[in-house]
Amino acid sequence: MVRGLMKFPGISTKLLNISVNSLCKFRNLERAETLLIDGIRLGVLPDVITYNTLIKGYTRFIGIDEAYAVTRRMREAGIEPDVTTYNSLISGAAKNLMLNRVLQLFDEMLHSGLSPDMWSYNTLMSCYFKLGRHGEAFKILHEDIHLAGLVPGIDTYNILLDALCKSGHTDNAIELFKHLKSRVKPELMTYNILINGLCKSRRVGSVDWMMRELKKSGYTPNAVTYTTMLKMYFKTKRIEKGLQLFLKMKKEGYTFDGFANCAVVSALIKTGRAEEAYECMHELVRSGTRSQDIVSYNTLLNLYFKDGNLDAVDDLLEEIEMKGLKPDDYTHTIIVNGLLNIGNTGGAEKHLACIGEMGMQPSVVTCNCLIDGLCKAGHVDRAMRLFASMEVRDEFTYTSVVHNLCKDGRLVCASKLLLSCYNKGMKIPSSARRAVLSGIRETVSYQAARKTHIKIKAAIECNTLMYP
């Protein structure tokens, strides 16, 4: 790109802007900066669009401070930031919920003699809503926007409808929608926002009504619309209706996100349609539309392990590596659990060791899975060594170890571990306490169990006083 620029000394600022914009879109800010310097050396001076493009790139991919630093360079070049400049900065700050920074930029814009536009106010209003400060958000809508002589558009109302739905006021959102229809034309996004709110409230009848409204307005549901409904059908156990919608989407060429596909596969398995589940996952992974989604591979990996198809597991893991996908915590947990289920405890331990060798920290869930599997296979000592090596443990870690120590007859060790949990203020399920006391009562004596119970009760009461 830079060499190409050097070859054409007659290039314009417009071409420079196109090149900078292209590099920024691909997150190559360093090359964009180099291109800008080369352009200046050739006498191609940047304009406000050039700097605004850089600022937008920095706010999206680097940080607000780095983006703001560009405004100083603008002024040094004799170019004053405009409303677009501040909108990019405000958007970057609002995205990270940096309200004070947003307000500071608003003040700076006003002091510079610039008037915020609807984008500016929409971004500020959205930030207030996301922070739960609805009063200030409504003040912008009812006062600030009108004082500025601006008229709210559908973008503004989309923000308001989304906030109402997310805060549980779906009925208010529907009433506002009915009121707005005579004033502004709803967008497809408007309907998707309301359908999402109704789906999360599990109001199936209202969702059907909103779909009819959407079609009456001349819109065609898109992948977002259908995927939202698909998730609701499966969450509300309307499996057949969900599968019908899935087949309709598939027929019409829609693509799905990882969650939707996993939900479909899970529903197919629950209804005894394992072959269709395999076919669905194979199509998803091989089609290329979701080939970069590790969630999809995780689902297929889990299916292969459950079916005992280890050759397919090996092939799939090789494919994941070839495609450059990065296994997540769930991938590693599936592998460890799958190896444990076929009795390969050594392989499960080796896989956990490999995670550490790759410079990653195994998740607590993966470690918990291995500890429980080792104990169930009778390798309690190996499980305890892993337990001792863990830097982070949760209540499930302790609960699993206590239960398994009791099953192995190591009641003294189990009771000491349980007491240490209560002394630290941890909330351990009562089932662990019952397992310890029952074991001591049956194998030692009722009196010993009574003494342990008194110690546990004292530890719980002590921590209740310290952390009420």
UniProtKB/Swiss-Prot annotation:
Gene3D superfamilies: Tetratricopeptide repeat domain. SUPFAM superfamilies: HCP-like. Keywords: Repeat. Signal peptide: none annotated. The keyword Repeat applies. InterPro entries: Pentatricopeptide_rpt, PPR/CCM1_RNA-binding, TPR-like_helical_dom_sf. This is Pentatricopeptide repeat-containing protein At5g46680. Belongs to the PPR family. P subfamily. Pfam families: PPR, PPR_1, PPR_2. PPR repeats lie at residues 12-46, 47-81, 82-116, 117-152, 153-183, 187-221, 222-256, 257-291, 293-327, 328-362, 363-393, 394-428.
